Amino acid sequence: FSLRNSAANFTLDEIGSAVEYVHERGKKLYITLNIFAHNCHTSRMEQYLKELAEHPVDAVIIADPGVLSLVRDIMPDTACHISTQANCTNTRAADFWYKQGVKRVVLARELSLNEVSEISANSDCSTEVFVQGAMCISYSGRCYLSSYMANRGANLGDCAQSCRWKYSLVEEERPNEYYPIVEDGEYASVMSSRDLCMIQHIPEL
C-alpha cells in the first residue's frame, strides 16, 4: 500500500523482526501506506492493519484521510505522519492535520526553502522535508500520464515514469516524420523535472 510498489518490501514477519532489531538499538521504524486508496483497497488494507497492529511500529506514513481513519480505528496508539504525497503547502494545512492527531507532516517537495521555514516556524506540527530525489511533472505524484499511457497508476505505487521516456517531435501534417529532441547527447526527457537536490542547503534546513 505504499508508492514503492515494485520495491522488495518487507513481509509482516520481516517487519516484526525489523521492529525488534531497531528498537534494541534505540531507533524507530515507520511503515509507509501512502497510496490514494479506492474502495477496492480498503478491505485489504483493513486486514493488513489488523495484522500490522501485532507489531509495535513507531508510526505510519499516509496521504489519504480514509487511510488515516482506518489507522485510527485499528491502531489508535500508533503515531501518524502525513506523506509528501498529501501536498501540504501551507501552514493552515499543517495545522489541519495536527488537529486530526497527526504528529508530523512531510511537506510538499515543491516548496521553497523560505516557505519550509515559514511553515515550520508557525505550525505546532512537526515537519520533515525531502532533500534528494526525483521530482514529478505534477504536484508530488498527482499525475495521470502513467495511467493514460501505460495503464499503471502512479498514485497506487505503480508509476511507469512516462515523463522520462524518449520522445520525438511530430508535426501534424507530417505524421510519419519524427524529429529528435536532444538535451544531453542521448535523448530528451522533456516532461521530466530536474531531480531535487538540497544537499547544499542542509545547514539552513
Listing of model-derived features with the role each one plays in the protein:
Residues 1-88, 106-110, 114-205:
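Active-site pocket-lining/capping segments in soluble small-molecule metabolic enzymes
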Residues 91-92:
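Conserved nucleotide-cofactor-binding alpha/beta core module
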Residues 101-102:
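As written
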